[in-house]
Each structure stands twice: as structure tokens, then as C-alpha cells.
Amino acid sequence: MDNEQYKIAHLNMVQNVINRMGNNCFLIKGWAITLLSALLTVLWEKGHLWIMFIPLILFWYLDSFYLRQERLYRNLYNKIIAGDQAVVKYSLCTKNCENNKTKLQAAAFSRSIAPFYVTIAALPLSYCLFSLLKYLLK
């Protein structure tokens, strides 16, 4: 195999990882909506909507983790295309691909994740605030 074929094979490997990470983000959002909707229906009558924050935070973390990983692999992909000599053939190591966009906090508050989870968190948060306000005004 010549160098160009190695590069194409390596890019295909990295592209497959990127696709899996994107698919994981999609699945996590689906599970988050399903589980949090079920919790909403069960906990609404009992008034314990604050419990919804536990799985919400866990799903938010998982989604952010996978987006971070996806960004790291996209950086690796770009380095392979650029012909970076620091990238070892067939290596999927992303240690040298860190930047400000690949930090977990940047992923958690990105445009594709934060609005989704903030919107979901708005319902139990508003319910808890109204309940507290109702309690304080008695």
C-alpha cells in the first residue's frame, strides 16, 4: 500500500468513530426525552419534579462527553488530512487534538446541547419555583 491508501484507510477509521459518536448523541437525546417524559407523568401528582434533575444532569453529561469525543476525532481527522507528522498511522489517539472547543464545558454549553437540556429543565424548575413561591406566600 502506498502512503495515499494508508491515509484513506486511516481517514475511514476515524470517520467511522465520528459517525458512532454522532449516533450516540442522537440516541442519548432520544432516551432523555423518553425517560424524562415518563418521570414527568409519574412525579407530577406527587410534586417531586426536582427528581427529574438527576437523570437530566446525567444525560447532559453523557451527551457532552460524546460531543467532546466527536470534536476530538474531527480534529484528528483534520490533522490526518493536513499530513501532520505527529499523527501515527492507524492511531486513534486524540491526546494531541485538544483545544478550547474540545473541553467538556464547551461541549456542554454548545448550541447543539445546551438549548435542548435547558428547555427540558425549564418545566421542573418553574414548577419547583412556583411551589416554593406558593409555600412562602402562605
Located regions from the model:
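Alpha-helical transmembrane segments of integral membrane proteins
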Residues: 24-27, 31, 50, 54, ...
